[in-house]
Amino acid sequence: NKHIENYLRSLERIRYNIFNKIKQYNKYVVNEDEKLMYLNDRYEVTKFENYLKIYIPEVIPKYKNVNNYAYKNITLNVMEKTKIYKDLYKDELVFVFIKIVENQKNIDIDNKFVKSIIDGLVLSKVIEDDNIANMFYGVFGTSEKKKKPYTEVYIFKGKMMLDWLQNFINADIK
């Protein structure tokens, strides 16, 4: 229904604008206790010896439901959180592994719009470009009924992909 789609887009725009207002407010607050906590504060990046891990505390939009605001919020958060790792993979072929966790039983993983994650990594210059000479990616979906949906992103040198994937699959199966 077109009305529902327009309504959802409006809600996403409102959410994005509220997040921006909170970000601006927090920028000028002197006392840390007065800062407002919100979803974007829960994005995390951790550097390990051989890879970079990003935690995204929200649902990745589906292709059919994607709009500029959901895409933009995820892209800008990934960019902001990873910019301290600029040039980490300069001139490297990089593999980006995206694990999407939903709390529903049936996930149609090929309908997830992961471009916002890759674009954030390019904008922060963690990876040089998203063309085939610089990166490739894979997406894994799983369901955890008792948890809120989230996404984990692992970035590492492409040559490490096979070993890493084998370890990941073995750990997830146990």
PLM regions and their residue ranges:
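N-terminal targeting/trafficking signals and adjacent low-complexity tails
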Residues: 1-35, 42-51
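C-terminal edge-of-domain segments
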Residues: 130-174
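An N-terminal amphipathic alpha-helical segment
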Residues: 65-95, 103-107
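Residues at beta-strand starts and edge strands
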Residues: 50, 91-96, 147-151
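Short, surface-exposed beta-strand/loop "edge" segments at domain boundaries and coil↔beta transitions
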Residues: 61-65, 104-108, 160-166
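Short amphipathic
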Residues: 45-60, 97-102
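Short glycine/proline-enriched loop/turn "hinge" motifs that connect secondary-structure elements
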Residues: 45-47, 86-91, 145
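Short, hydrophobic/π-rich interface segment
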Residues: 100-136, 140-142
